[in-house]
Amino acid sequence: MRPPSRCPGMRHNDGVSDIVRVLLLGSTGSIGTQALEVIAANPDKFEVVGLAARGGNPALLAEQMAATGTRNVAVADPAAGAALDIKLAGPHAVTELVRRTEADVVLNALVGSLGLEPTLATLTAGTRLALANKESLVAGGSLVTRAAAPGQIVPVDSEHSALAQCLRGGRADEVDRLVLTASGGPFRGWTAQMLESVNPEAAKAHPTWSMGLMNTLNSASLVNKGLELIETHLLFGIPYDRIDVTVHPQSIVHSMVTFVDGSTLAQASPPDMKLPIALALGWPDRVPGAAAACDFSTASTWTFEPVDTEVFPAVELARQAGQAGGSVTAVYNAANEVAVQAFLDGRIRFPEIVRTVARAVEAADRWRAEPETVEDVLAADRWARGRAAELVGA
């Protein structure tokens, strides 16, 4: 286990400053738009050398192309490609863009399993990967970690960015436990019975973070924290039984590392994704003014409490999926995506999201073998989606 390393292949301009060439995947999403703001605010540090998106918001993508001046663009949706006269379009277009673009860092902010192949292409090319697409790591598992050189993946999630920063404070053999923090979501303190009446609008309201729809819904069910638990194990190599999750409603402390001597290092900052985005783009260097700092001149309280695992079983279910090994984590992720859509469509109640995931994971014994190819992962993904669709009555 080691913190991410310095960006390979960074070029030098005028022998004075380093300009990091950024290929941004998922540019029209929440992380992508914030990343472009970070880049625009730091033209002496970063430049955009390519954009990619699924294609659901072609108008915004057109604006981004104009603002960045790049025509090196790919979209997964052929219709969006035709509308914007983008030649590189289709299901493998984003991966092809990664292969043909010279970049110092690829920021993968795609949503869902669409990000897996671009993640592997980035790692194969030896380019630093700023990873916000947690699903590609969770689904790909050992397939992704085997493809990565030590320190090649830099996390963008605030929790894993916090862990990477805290791990600078000690050696690998000094680490005792990793502690992920969770806001608890909009339904913290609710009973299981109360959750039965939750509607999609209530689940879309996160108390502290501004995120995309899928991440917001996953945060409400704590599936997001389950995915982050799996990601933590894969990124840092710490066994699942040495990774804890605690509820911290203020979302100021983003994660902690406890060392063998009893000391704990925590990374704290007001909730703003621009900080971990900027750090991932410039790693290991910090970007001055990336986000506001904590204000200790006014009274404030930071609280911590255990996760109510009976009401919110998603975290422990993720731990079980991870300990099962193989592609069971891919099953966890894919079944959740199907169940979330069923909830949004009004076909199941909110607690049935995690119940559906649990039933899919329980039936996933055939997927315990370690994946050897992308097709192995996609096969588990397809099976899980089919199984979840049956369970939700699709």
UniProtKB/Swiss-Prot annotation:
EC number(s) recorded for this UniProt protein: 1.1.1.267
A Pfam short name: DXP_redisom_C
Keyword field: Isoprene biosynthesis, Manganese, Metal-binding, NADP, Oxidoreductase
Cofactor section: Mg(2+); Mn(2+)
Record pathway: Isoprenoid biosynthesis; isopentenyl diphosphate biosynthesis via DXP pathway; isopentenyl diphosphate from 1-deoxy-D-xylulose 5-phosphate: step 1/6
Binding site for NADPH: 28-31, 57, 133, 135, 212
One BP term from GO: isopentenyl diphosphate biosynthetic process, methylerythritol 4-phosphate pathway involved in terpenoid biosynthetic process
Keyword flag Nucleotidyltransferase: no
GO molecular function, one term: manganese ion binding
Catalytic activity line of the entry: 2-C-methyl-D-erythritol 4-phosphate + NADP(+) = 1-deoxy-D-xylulose 5-phosphate + NADPH + H(+)
NCBIfam families cross-referenced by the UniProt entry: Dxr
UniProt family annotation: Belongs to the DXR family.
Protein name: 1-deoxy-D-xylulose 5-phosphate reductoisomerase
Organism: Nocardia farcinica (strain IFM 10152)
Gene expressing this chain: dxr
